[in-house]
Amino acid sequence: DEYVNYRVNIKKNTSKEGINKTLVPLYLALDYGEKNGIVKKSVVAPILGNFLITRNTKYQSEPSEEEKTRYLTPEQMKYFYDYCKKVKSKNARIILDMFFFSYFACGLRLSDVITLEWKHIDFEKRLLSKVQVKTKRKAAVDIPLNSSAMEILERWKNYRLNDRFVFNRLPDDFDLNNQYKLFMTRNAQDKGVNRVLATVGRNAKLPITVTMHVARHSFAVKSINKGMSIYMLSKLLGHSSIAATEKTYAQFLQEKVSNDILVMNEEF
């Protein structure tokens, strides 16, 4: 309470979302202290996870969709895909599988990749059906899986590393209803995953810093250029509204319209 008062009254931070973000490292430190016997559980329990209540109480540290949209063209993605076949590090190859699966599976967020369960996959219908972690919709999103996505899934099915979670990033008894624990786990994995992707991307001489969200944006921009409807794209990305999709990809939508008009004007 004293820290929150400090943020509000001294630092003049009136955004509850902003204050909640500053609480995360404190909670991480407390969690570490308890696990290593530095702080008693009786001290930590009443404090841990007490975020301020906002309109949306699910705190996900996913990158904002409104941040600068960095993406790879289909040609750059194909080059990166071929380059990554030469990567030797086992950990890097696991993370690269997650990255390319995100791209092939219609831009799944990292939180949905790490929480992807085998029960979400219909191998016969080549369909992924899952309630997305960050979306405000409660209905599952159905995502058709192409051959490249299926190839990755078949490979992981043969690995048999986890009876529940596809990419073995969570223990099979993980409680997905524990929003605080899910947030902390995803937040802890985010930096490590993106650090590996950035390193491999840099070694591949790519023009941008590669992150998991680059896979998402690359899928979206490719889909816009291929003529996918904004309604369908919004649904596949799990956006709360079409307006959110239009806002994020406004530049690319305008470019597509302009190019289409130029083509039409060339016709007699």
Where do the model's predicted regions map?
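N-terminal core-binding DNA-recognition domain of tyrosine recombinases/integrases
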Residues: 1-63, 83-86
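Short, charged phosphate-coordinating catalytic segments
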Residues: 31-42, 102-125
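Conserved tyrosine-mediated DNA breakage-rejoining catalytic core shared by Y-recombinases
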Residues: 49-50, 54, 115-155
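DNA breakage-rejoining catalytic core of tyrosine-based enzymes
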Residues: 53-82, 137-146, 161-164
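Short, basic (Lys/Arg/His-rich) helix/loop patches that form interaction surfaces
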Residues: 87-90, 185, 194-235
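Short, polar N-cap/turn motifs at the start of nucleic acid-interacting alpha helices
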Residues: 120-127, 206-208, 228-248
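C-terminal catalytic core of Y-nucleophile DNA break-rejoin enzymes
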Residues: 135-155, 163-199
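DNA/chromatin major-groove-contacting recognition/catalytic segments
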Residues: 141, 247, 251-268
